[in-house]
Each structure stands twice: as structure tokens, then as C-alpha cells.
Amino acid sequence: MKKLIIAGLSIGLLAGCGSTDNKSEAKDYTAQSSTSETNNKKTSKHPFPKDATPVGEGKIKVSTPAGNSENGNAPVLFANNNDLMLHLGIDYANFQGDKQTFVYVDKIFKETLQVAELTQTSIILSEDTLKPGLHTVTAVQFENDDPKGKVLNFIEAKYEVKEKK
């Protein structure tokens, strides 16, 4: 009889120690979610030039496996939620090599490059820039490399993201 009671208490003790506190895990997850949502608000390191229109002799062409943006086309890039990042090819032409080129995607600053007569590179797309829809890549050169200064070159090209099946 004592063995039965001891066995029952042992099983109860092991079961009690093995359980997890789901309430605290849920609170931790909620706190992490709200923190990550706060951090996901997009801010741009360099502001997008206001009221800028195409100017200068610079040209850009974006390329995907489906084609490129020549003649105003918007090449298609297939993506889904499993794609964390994808590369988008960009060809730059007729930019001033002594100036930095500020690259924006959907008016959010991505990177600064030194490009000249003919330069090929790629940028990494992730998060919002991989959501289905039409997206815009903008290359801008400023006087004295000051993003608040006069725009010397301003050119845009588009690409379209479609849901991968």
C-alpha cells in the first residue's frame, strides 16, 4: 500500500515539475511581438528628395529573371513569405563618378554607391520591398554629396513583385 502511495506521489511530482507555465510564455511572446512591431517602422537614414523630378543624364535599368526595365517596362520578380531576401540587378549609366549615388527603394534609403559611366551591381530586397505590387528604385546624386542639397541626377525604374505559387 505504501508503495502505491509513493508511486502516485512520485508521478504527480514529476508531472507537476515537467509542466510549463503557458501564461508567462504568452506574455513573453506578446512583449516580443510589440517590440518587433515598434522596431519595424521604416525610417530612412537619408530623406528622399522632395518634389524631385527626373533630371540629369544618369540612367538605371533594373533586371530580374523575367527581364529588365528598358523602355519603361516593370520586370516581374516572383516571391513569397519563405523568401527572406532576393537580389535585384541594377545597371547604372552616365552618372558622375566623383559623386556618391544614393539608392532608394520605395522612397526608403537603401545604400550609397560610387558609380560612373557603366556600373553593374545588385541590391538586396527584403521585407516590404518583396511584398506583391509595383515598387520603385530611385538613384539620386546630390551637389556636394549632401542629401539635403540640390539634385544633380534623379532617375527611377520600376519592378513588380508577384506571389510565387
Model-flagged regions — what are they?
Residues 1-4:
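Positively charged n-region of N-terminal signal peptides that target proteins for export
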Residues 13-16:
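C-terminal motif of bacterial Sec signal peptides marking the signal peptidase cleavage site
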Residues 68-115, 120, 124:
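Contiguous segments within soluble domain cores/interaction surfaces
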Residues 127-134:
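Surface-exposed, short loops/turns at beta-strand junctions within beta-sandwich domains
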Residues 142-150:
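Short acidic/polar inter-strand loop motif in beta-rich domains
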Residues 149-165:
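Short beta-strand elements
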